[in-house]
């Protein structure tokens, strides 16, 4: 049985395009794990089909900056002229529901969270870095999405190269050959770290 009193938090880390979102969809279907995705707050405009409070918490830049000043974020970052951040209140809400929060963050955000909370015994961190099968495959996945210009793809790839250098900062590393295989490996890691 999963020990919910440990206040486990899963940090799922990896470069953009590595498949974290697809892996999460599989993990959230698990009857064994009681996972909930921590929704981030953002100042970016809502995309078609997105719902406030479901996909993100869409807030104004002023409100976001006020939350920064009040130390309401576990971490926050500016990405392509928009703020993104993980609200501590969202994590506490997930705990109150008897579930394990999953934070899908880039390396920079993960490092900020771990720096801020590493000496606090409040949380049991399960840090997992998702690797692409190869750098070329990562680029192919980003291109196939069809959502970015060549310039944005180049920026994402340069950022991914930097993020891959930090992979050893995380306790577990898995390679996403297929989302099913990666999700199975991650489920085993989470079960091992949360039992007892």
From Swiss-Prot:
Keywords, alphabetical: ATP-binding, Cytoplasm, Kinase, Nucleotide-binding, Transferase
Molecular functions (GO terms): ATP binding; guanylate kinase activity
SMART domains with a match to the protein in the record: GuKc
InterPro entries: GK/Ca_channel_bsu, Guanylate_kin-like_dom, Guanylate_kinase, Guanylate_kinase_CS, P-loop_NTPase
Transferase in keyword set: yes
Compartments, record wording: Cytoplasm
UniProt binding sites for ATP: 14-21
Catalytic reaction list: GMP + ATP = GDP + ADP
SUPFAM superfamilies from the UniProt entry: P-loop containing nucleoside triphosphate hydrolases
CDD domains on file: GMPK
Listed EC numbers: 2.7.4.8
All residue ranges annotated as the Guanylate kinase-like domain in the record: 7-191
Gene Ontology, cellular component aspect: cytosol
Function as written in the Swiss-Prot or TrEMBL entry: Essential for recycling GMP and indirectly, cGMP.
Family, as annotated: Belongs to the guanylate kinase family.
Protein name, per record: Guanylate kinase
Lineage per the UniProt record: Bacteria, Bacillati, Mycoplasmatota, Mycoplasmoidales, Metamycoplasmataceae
């Amino acid at each position: 049985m999963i020990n919910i009193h440990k206040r486990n938090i899963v940090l799922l880390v990896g470069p953009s395009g590595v498949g974290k979102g697809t892996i999460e969809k599989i993990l959230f279907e698990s009857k064994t794990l009681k996972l909930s995705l921590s929704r981030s707050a953002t100042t970016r405009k809502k995309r078609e089909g997105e719902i406030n409070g479901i996909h993100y918490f869409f807030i104004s830049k002023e409100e976001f900056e006020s939350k920064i000043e009040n130390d309401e974020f576990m971490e926050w970052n500016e990405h392509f002229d928009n703020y993104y951040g993980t609200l501590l209140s969202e994590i506490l809400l997930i705990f109150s529901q008897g579930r394990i929060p999953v934070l899908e963050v880039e390396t920079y955000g993960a490092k900020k969270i771990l720096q801020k909370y590493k000496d606090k015994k409040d949380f049991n961190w399960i840090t997992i870095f998702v690797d692409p099968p190869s750098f070329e495959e990562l680029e192919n996945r980003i291109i196939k999405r069809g959502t970015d210009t060549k310039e944005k793809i180049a920026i994402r790839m340069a950022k991914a190269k930097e993020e891959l250098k930090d992979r050893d900062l995380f306790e577990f590393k898995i390679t996403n050959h297929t989302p099913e295989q990666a999700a199975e490996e991650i489920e085993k890691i989470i079960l091992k770290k949360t039992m007892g």
